[in-house]
Amino acid sequence: MDELNRKTVEEFKQAEKNKIIVLLDNIRSAYNVGSIFRTADAFLIECIFICGYTPPPTHRSVHKTALGAVDTVDWMQFDTVEDAINQLRENDYAVYAIEQAEKSISLEQFQVPLNKKIAIVFGNEVVGVQDKVMQLANGCIEIPQHGMKHSLNVGVAAGIVLWKLVHP
């Protein structure tokens, strides 16, 4: 560790992680992906699943924005979101979409099911989480908003949700 009590990459890899997987589905911006990697590093997130046309950590802009978090946070790439969700289900993860929807649960009210591993799906910056993902998910979580836009940057939304999940 250095003077700021930061773990080395190896210490981070060995550290116990929060049983949360972040699934990024068709995120356009490499900068948003890099930001989410940094957030995942900050909160000891288990893994990030990259789906669809989401830029992978090997993309120059993701790597630059992530400030090294692509080396500490595990990640996997999937051609389709369905493939990713199938793998999550096979490994006993509950899948929750982050989206504004009729039957969504407020993030303030959401409680992680006891002894359950969870995956959180963040969708495209313009169209959000796909309908097919909403149908496959165990539920939908919504970030309460009080302004006029009811729209958050996906990187900001990831930070809010992940902070809440690791600080119930």
Feature map (PLM): residue ranges:
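Post-transcriptional modification and biogenesis factors for structured RNAs
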Residues: 1-168
